């Protein structure tokens, strides 16, 4: 409810959607759902990026960030960024069926650090393949700590 009554919040989501055929089959996950009731201050503050294909990878997610989410963040100028980090899109996860590498998670977080004076909270949401979840979380932490990201690193479970 906080989202519907607060004009100072933006909710941005990247979801596997498959034209509403993927769980949880919510109409609210589609691109044209833009937030609460029109008479609430939050109308237009919900940004959904529904993914209608599986097996999308780093370049797809980086494009979503660079072409959609980062320009919105630049315009909105947030005071803080909270990330619900679902690693379902990680390579090897049976639920997400995507191909995002652990290094890409680090890169995405690193790109968000340019906003809100680097004030970012990251909360684990999901991911069902422990190897890619662990590596993705490690790369996320490395980015938060300002460590150099090894984008060429190869992971044992991927070979």
Role assignments for model-derived ranges:
Residues 1-159:
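A general "terminal functional-core" signal
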């Amino acid at each position: 409810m906080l989202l519907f009554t607060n004009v100072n919040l933006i909710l941005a989501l990247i979801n596997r959607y498959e034209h509403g055929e993927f769980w949880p089959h919510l109409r609210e996950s589609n691109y044209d759902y833009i937030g609460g009731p029109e008479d609430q201050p939050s109308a237009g503050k919900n940004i959904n990026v529904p993914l209608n294909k599986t097996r999308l990878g780093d370049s797809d997610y980086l494009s979503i960030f660079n072409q959609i989410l980062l320009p919105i963040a630049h315009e909105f100028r947030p005071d803080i960024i909270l990330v619900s980090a679902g690693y379902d899109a990680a390579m090897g996860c049976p639920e997400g069926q995507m191909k995002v590498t652990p290094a890409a998670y680090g890169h995405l977080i690193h790109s968000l650090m340019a906003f809100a004076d680097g004030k970012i909270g990251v909360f684990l949401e999901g991911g069902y393949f422990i190897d890619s979840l662990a590596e993705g979380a490690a790369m996320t932490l490395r980015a938060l700590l300002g460590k150099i990201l090894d984008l060429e690193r190869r992971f044992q479970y991927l070979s």
